[in-house]
Curated annotation (Swiss-Prot):
GO terms for biological process: innate immune response; negative regulation of cell growth; positive regulation of DNA-templated transcription; regulation of defense response to virus; regulation of DNA-templated transcription. The keyword Transcription regulation applies. It comes from Mus musculus. Disulfide bonds: none annotated. It comes from the Eukaryota. This is SERTA domain-containing protein 3. InterPro entries: SERTA_dom, SERTAD3. It is found in: Nucleus; Nucleus, Nucleolus. One of its GO terms (cellular component) is cytoplasm. Interacts with RPA2. Its main location: nucleus. Residues 1-23 are annotated as: Disordered. Keywords: Activator, Antiviral protein, Host-virus interaction, Immunity, Innate immunity, Nucleus, Transcription, Transcription regulation.
Length: 197
């Protein structure tokens, strides 16, 4: 059974707008609350049930909006409250960046079901647990804030590049082809013999 939608009157919308305090500190705490909720949802989606693409997209979009808002907002004068109880050294942007990378990775790993009827079976709903090494790398600063180009700097492309075999340059004619030079004629005659045989 689906839920019923309730329509707001114009008066209710005005009252709701008046309730919100959009001062910098209130906005910062609102963003941190959204981040915590998104983190909880990401951690719950790594559980034994099948991940939902719609949920990943919603969380991904929320985190991108938060990251964009944080980059544009000036730094607060007060120190922000810790994001994690045991890991206070993480910055907000590093955390958001790692979550976005983890979401992208998990979305890439998801494969669409080949048969829609087969996807509803209980066996297909059980997904293996996430790799602990992957989660450890995700929770640490292993990936950091490096850009996409930084990942490709160490790749050796020399084996991929096509070596074009150019013929060796011809020696200048002034060295060997001087008029009356018997060496040039001798070499030319030897080449004719080799090619002719």
């Amino acid at each position: 059974m689906g839920g019923l939608k309730r329509k707001h009157s114009d008066l209710e919308e005005e009252e709701e707008e008046e309730k919100w305090d959009w001062s910098p500190t209130a906005l910062r705490s609102y963003q941190q609350a959204l981040l915590r909720i998104s983190l909880d949802k990401v951690q719950r989606s790594l559980g034994p049930r099948a991940p939902s693409l719609r949920r990943h997209v919603l969380i991904h979009n929320t985190l991108q909006q938060l990251q964009a808002a944080i980059r544009l907002a000036p730094a607060p004068a007060l120190p922000p409250e810790p994001l994690f109880l045991g890991e206070e050294d993480f910055s907000l942007s590093t955390t958001i960046g790692s979550i976005l990378r983890e979401l992208d990775t998990s979305m890439d790993e998801m494969e669409p079901p080949l048969n829609p009827a087969a996807s509803s079976s209980p066996q297909n709903e059980i997904v293996s647990q996430a790799d602990p090494v992957f989660l450890e790398a995700l929770s640490s600063r292993y990936l950091g804030d490096s850009g996409l180009d930084d990942f490709f700097l160490d790749i050796d492309t020399s084996a991929v590049e096509k070596d074009v075999a150019l013929p060796p340059p011809e020696p200048p004619h002034s060295l060997f082809c001087s008029p009356g030079s018997w060496e040039w004629n001798e070499l030319d005659h030897i080449m004719e013999i080799i090619l002719g045989s």
